[in-house]
């Protein structure tokens, strides 16, 4: 885009995580292992849920979509970050930057909404167990999934449209390892007031609606579990929620820290670390969190292993 005598650059330069040449190769190896682990665990969980009939339940349909989102999320960010460790000139095309930002917002919003839907699913399962099969049918599950992806797409479209209106005349150096809004706002030569307002409003709307849904769901879950007399019943009810609560705490805690702060508290160096955590580390942790101590997933893995051994 052009504005007066200003022409938007065809490429941006990403500063990456560090300029220290001694750290480039060690960091490349660390994040390559993390990315490989992320893909293997998330795609493995997607395949396991798809192949095992015992896991064809609403809870695992949502978990399958969460794993897809995490795998896609990591793929949008990590490969380019890995390239910055090896390249002397860390460039990304203008179109590539816009597409990365669009995908990033789409997947972030999808994860917010998925975590909220998963909390509602746990609420229905624990608080209304007799009605659960009729309320959370497969058709309802897939409608919820399609709906949340549609909302995420619209949110991403609005943010990306706002970004396309900005001009970048003075600098094309993005002080980050991917194309995020705040670093791009920093180098914009046009006003970003509306863009920043949109980030706050949209972020507050989606994050707060997700958090409120999760909080209300868990208030009712706790009240229901407290009334269960048997210790085994209480343990079983809580055990289905602990992994979700861990995932929610990690993801929402980091995102709130990142995006719902005032501009005065904004620090690019601090945000690089926070961004690294929720774009690279959390997608690796989620499948481990949901699989760890999950008897149904372990049983499904045993069945798959036994079938493979029998076939051979």
UniProtKB/Swiss-Prot annotation:
Q: Where in the cell?
A: Cell membrane
Whether Glycoprotein counts among this entry's keywords is: yes
Annotated membrane topology: Multi-pass membrane protein
Cysteine disulfide partners in this protein:
97-179
Cytoplasmic topology: which positions?
Answer: 50-57, 121-139, 227-239, 293-312
Residues bearing glycans: 5
Sorted alphabetically, the keyword list is:
Cell membrane, Disulfide bond, G-protein coupled receptor, Glycoprotein, Membrane, Olfaction, Receptor, Sensory transduction, Transducer, Transmembrane, Transmembrane helix
The similarity comment for this entry is: Belongs to the G-protein coupled receptor 1 family.
The name this protein carries in UniProt is Olfactory receptor-like protein COR2
Species in which this protein is naturally found? Gallus gallus
Q: What is the lineage of its organism?
A: Eukaryota, Metazoa, Chordata, Craniata, Vertebrata
